[in-house]
Regions:
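Dual-mode signal for accessory low-complexity, basic/Gly-rich regions
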Residues: 161-315
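Active-site bordering "gate/hinge" segments
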Residues: 1-198, 205, 214-217, 304-306
């Protein structure tokens, strides 16, 4: 942490948010932006963990993030969007210097242009089957919702069924083919600067990268000490608590699809007719995580290997 969050005043955050609001209200377009909800969060998570094994762990993880929800009016039609799209915000673990690294003075105007074009775009109807390419925002959400949560072993055992839902997996799912050989999904809390960063979980177990899916085969689940003991393996450090007086439960950290060997341009060049959905503004998923629905925000028609016009809200 280069710039201590304890030295950041409310006035500093308000000043940045006023600047951001100025970028939005001065945006020259034929859509109006009558309502803006903007926020900056910062926190220092401090933990001191002690157990009967003789473990003593002190950790401090600072985090900062920027969030926004903006209402747009185009020809009397209201819609909401966020910058960045998808409501997740811009976030990092680190000091106040991370907010500066977002370069909001350039980022916000660039995203407003994209948002304006997306809102004004028209829907496309396809009679035939088409190829769909999704951007990192949607790929990350798919990894989170369809791999992260259903791979939490306590959920698989029915521990959270009444509140958080169930899983489509069984406890004996290791070795099951779940995707093509191109699919690699990991969960890694050790990535420096990430929002999901931690070095020890809340049962005192050292964190590590968990390879959930390898070449389309399920190879690991997210475990705490209890669920791992039921499988006669070691916990992989996924037990986490929101507060000191709350029971730790199994939760993912940074869950993602591993990069492959193709660049985006190469993927697009192979598509004769399709859609590239870069990000999203709406999604739904069932309690067992089997079925999901994603509605694109910034999206483009693909024709003969090239990006074409904007497409409105592809599903």
């Amino acid at each position: 942490m280069k710039e201590n969050l304890k030295n950041v005043h409310v006035a500093d955050m308000i000043s940045i948010l006023k600047d951001v609001d100025g970028y939005i209200t001065s945006f020259n377009s034929d859509i109006s932006l009558p309502n803006r909800t903007l926020g900056i969060d910062n926190s220092i998570e401090e933990k001191f963990y002690v157990n009967t094994e003789g473990t003593h762990i002190l950790s401090r993880v600072p985090r900062v993030s920027f969030h926004s929800i903006i209402t747009a009016n185009h020809n009397g039609q209201l819609s909401a969007f966020s910058i960045p799209a998808g409501y997740a915000g811009l976030g990092r673990s680190g000091g106040w210097e991370k907010i500066k690294s977002f370069d909001l003075s350039s980022y916000i105007p660039e995203q407003l242009v994209i948002a304006s074009n997306s809102i004004k775009s028209k829907s496309e109807k396809f009679e035939e089957d088409i190829d769909v390419i999704v951007g990192p925002d949607i790929a990350g959400l798919v990894a989170h919702e369809s791999c992260g949560h259903p791979f939490e072993a306590d959920r698989i055992l029915g521990r959270e069924a009444a509140q958080a839902g169930e899983s489509y997996l069984g406890f004996d799912c290791n070795g099951t083919k779940i995707g093509s050989k191109e699919v690699y999904v990991s969960d890694d809390p050790t990535i420096p600067g990430s929002m999901g960063f931690y070095l020890f979980d809340d049962e005192g177990v050292e964190s590590k990268k968990r390879k959930l899916i390898t070449a389309g085969i399920i190879t690991d689940l997210l475990h705490n000490r209890e669920t791992s003991s039921k499988m006669n393996i070691q916990s992989n450090g996924a037990s986490r608590s929101t507060e000191f007086d709350k029971e730790p439960v199994i939760r993912m950290s940074n869950t993602f699809i591993e990069p492959g060997n193709y660049e985006l341009e190469e993927l697009i060049s192979d598509v004769k007719s399709g859609v590239y959905i870069k990000n999203f503004m709406e999604w739904n998923i069932d309690d067992r995580r089997e079925n999901q629905r994603y509605v694109g925000f910034e999206a483009y028609r693909i024709k003969n290997g090239e990006l074409d016009i904007h497409v409105n809200s592809p599903v």
